[in-house]
Amino acid sequence: MPYRKHREKKYEAKYREAFKVFQEEIGITFTDEKLLIQAFTHSSYVNEHRKKPHEDNERLEFLGDAVLELTVSQYLFQKYPTMSEGELTKLRAAIVCEPSLVRFANEMSFGSLVLLGKGEEMTGGRERPALLADVFEAFIGALYLDQGLETVWGYLKEVVYPKINEGAFSHVMDYKSQLQELIQRDGSGNVEYQILQEKGPAHNREFVSRVTLNNEALGLGSGKSKKEAEQQAAAEALKKLKEQS
């Protein structure tokens, strides 16, 4: 057997074993293992192995992107029933953006499984953020095709959703949403807003709002609209709670 073919067979056996271990670690066994391998196959690897029936992960990445958007949207819709469309969109964008996907991929050691061409390997492709984000999306796409939406949901429940619950994306929320999330996380009770005062002429109104937690005042705020006053009250409440913790 020529040396090159022998080396390729050894490499193939090595990565198949790696994918077997990976499936054991995540507790999911693919019905079609080719889909799993394709999710981790970069175009540079396919270009160097043209005689073999390899497919790269770009189409799976396209599908995974849509599946991620849907599942994360559904989770946020259910978790934050009072959050506005604009805030939900902003929060979802923070969760599915490249740096977040890279973080998820790194925590699962996806980089070590990627099949790369030699040139891409030599230029540090395995650590390249865009590549890792693409692989995470492709994996979600492959998981969806092989196991369906329920398994994808279960996987994200282990890998992504806990980080939302821990407040990893709170910085992109408005003050009211941040406060609501903090209270939900701590299981402290119910937050309520009251408009205490409206003053000034119609063209220049000022509103004063109070936010309470279990009927205890947490913060006061004022603004040119009820919404602005409530946001300022929530900001004061957040500051107070952070000082106490």
Swiss-Prot record:
It is found in: Cytoplasm. Residues 19-148 form the RNase III domain. Its cofactor is Mg(2+). It catalyses: Endonucleolytic cleavage to 5'-phosphomonoester. Its EC number is 3.1.26.3. The keyword NADP does not apply. Belongs to the ribonuclease III family. This is Ribonuclease 3. It comes from Bacillus mycoides (strain KBAB4). The lineage of its organism: Bacteria, Bacillati, Bacillota, Bacilli, Bacillales. The gene is rnc.
